[in-house]
Amino acid sequence: MDRSMMNRREFAFGAMAMAVPDTAPKYRVPKYRVIDAQVHVWINDPRYPWARETKDPPKENRTPAMLLELMKANGVERTVIAQYIGYLWDNRYALDSIRKYAPTFMGVCRVNPVDPAAPDQLSKLTEEGFHGVRISPAANAGGDWINGPLMPPLWKRAESLGVPMQVYTPITRIPDLAHLIEQCPNLNVVIDHMADCPVDQPRELDKLIALSRYPRVYIKVSHLWTVSRQPYPWLDAQEHVRRLYAAYGPQRLLWASDWPVDLGWTTYARALSVVRDDMKFLNAEDKSWILSMTAERVWPFP
């Protein structure tokens, strides 16, 4: 198991997640249903044990019931639950959550990318109810498996199953995805969090823009609050969104809160309002795509 995959943000925020209170905003109800393309859920419960490698698990629970309250307060109707890395490949809590609260949630699972059985595991998890798989190749040598022989079978299996490949990786790794995308022309590929491109390295974003030549690549508009060096509404990070919007169009951008990771920096309400209210270069139709219709393309919400 590649321990370098365990991104520091996904482990470090457990204690921070209560740092910023969330409040219900004032907003106009849109004519479309708002879809959050990524959250995580977890619970401290012996029925769902933490992975052995998770040395400092979050002490505060972050459950679907808690999320539903935020969704209702902010006018969000559907959400994608991505498997929390603290459970590694044990996807049961995410699966039980999407089943319990159907049809509100859809789920994205994790499989071990260095396990030759990963494609078959993905098939099984898809049959059980997941729609998508997430991988996280690290920037260092520990993430070099992205260029290894086990990746094409996993990507091709996702393509044959008709489920998206979700990739959370730093901007320096983005060029490594091109050969896999080219091998799977009918696979939807979702790049998480704008690849966390630093705002002080705008030329690095060219690597992400280069993937716009592939028509099934989608970009999550998220993590503005962590890459930004400014207060809300994070205008320096908005410049990344502006450039991605010019390259991909709104039809291939989709919003995600990344709750509860966001709570270490901001609120769920602001993670949404920055797109809905404060990106002045977006018109109403653009927002309907980024906040709703693009996600509908990737995840078949009922």
Predicted segments, located by residue:
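Short beta-strand segments
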Residues: 81-83, 110, 220-223, 254-256, ...
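Mid-domain alpha/beta scaffold segments of enzyme catalytic cores
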Residues: 21-153, 157-161, 199-202, 235
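Short Gly/Pro-enriched loop/turn and capping motifs at secondary-structure junctions
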Residues: 224-226, 259-262
